[in-house]
Amino acid sequence: MCIRDSDGTTTEYPAVDFSTVGVKAVDDHTLTYTLNFDFPGFLSLLSYAPYEPAYGPLLEEFADQFCTSAETACSCGAFYLAEYTPLENWVMKKNPENYDADSVYIDTVRYIYNQEELISGPEMVKRGEIDQATISSDILDSWLADDTTKDMVSMERPETGKSYFYIFNFLPYRHEFSNWTVTGVDAQYEPDNWAKAINSTNFRRAFLYAINPSVTLAVTAPEGYDNYKLHTITPPSFCANSKGVDYTECGGLANLSDFFDEAKAKEYRDAAVEELTAAGVTFPIKIQYPYNPAVVDWDKQCQVFKQQVEAVLNDGFDFISIIITQGPSDNFLNAVRRVGAYQLMSYYWGADYSDPETEVYPFYQEAGDRGT
């Protein structure tokens, strides 16, 4: 079998016996997959967009433009989009053509855009205008103390599909990628000084051991935050092995716990001071730490983080100065994170399917990829 490459050359490959292929069409509506290793996340993988069945005639018609827009895609889910008005509402209707339509018991789902909810959501819940809202830490105590509202309050379940962590900017300068421009941090945050510091292993380890996650988690989960702690990039209850053991309890992961250790933090800080002083770094090292004002309590988490970490690392030496900055409430991703307008930032990643490998995507970058 010969395959023509994009440069016009051809490559010859040996013929493949189709009986060895691990995918079989049993009938018009059934595929059988045969795996050559245990993969507990395989079923969730099949629900990921690239693995959804493709409608053959449409694929042939659009070729490499297939699924590049709403007009070139085709699917047959439980609901279809019946109405859509930007910044007003959208309506989903039950799809009678779905293969399992008899098991869909809701006929219509209506989403209504409500700008007011971002500002006065809790009061709208009181009035019965909306079903739920996020309560900021400013009013949580008063709601819990009020007999008319205390039973309305409940903690959100831990988000098992997302991993939360802190990220550093190792290249705080303007840089032109083929498909993206990184502006970097402003001169007032001393990017040259920062670049030397962040590329020091001792500096980064000082941060690792200085962060007490319980302090920042207590801002948004004062009723109990142990279930929200992460000790690795894979959240608990996200996936399990073929024997049903949670991935975070497998192998060496089972022994991971909080890294917070003041003595170790100061040990690495002192080593970093000696190393960085020799490299010409000036202290305190400025660290821009932006937040999105549209996210409830993010600003308060930043304040608590700053106080807690500086209390550890600045004990006995003026080591760092964390400078909290407010980003835009709209388009924060492109305006701050993707253009590198930060030195330290809180970050999260949502996996595409139940495989721990998907949690590592933010930590590497394909050639030509602008990053996340």
Residue ranges and their predicted role:
Residues 1-3, 92:
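Short, small-residue-biased leader/transition segments that mark boundaries at the very start
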Residues 4-19, 196-205, 209, 213, ...:
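Extracytoplasmic/peripheral linker and loop segments enriched in polar/acidic and small residues
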Residues 8-12, 16-19, 29, 35-110:
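Gly/Pro-rich hinge or "lid" segments in bacterial periplasmic/extracellular proteins
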Residues 31, 77-79, 90-91, 107-112, ...:
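Short, well-ordered beta-strand elements
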Residues 48, 97-144, 160:
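Ligand-site clamp/hinge motif
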Residues 93, 194-313:
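Append "and occasionally in soluble cytosolic enzymes with long acidic Gly/Pro-rich linkers
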Residues 93-97, 115, 162-202, 219:
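A bilobed periplasmic-binding-protein/Venus flytrap-type ligand-binding module shared by bacterial periplasmic
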Residues 125-126, 130-135, 147-153, 308-372:
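Periplasmic binding protein-like
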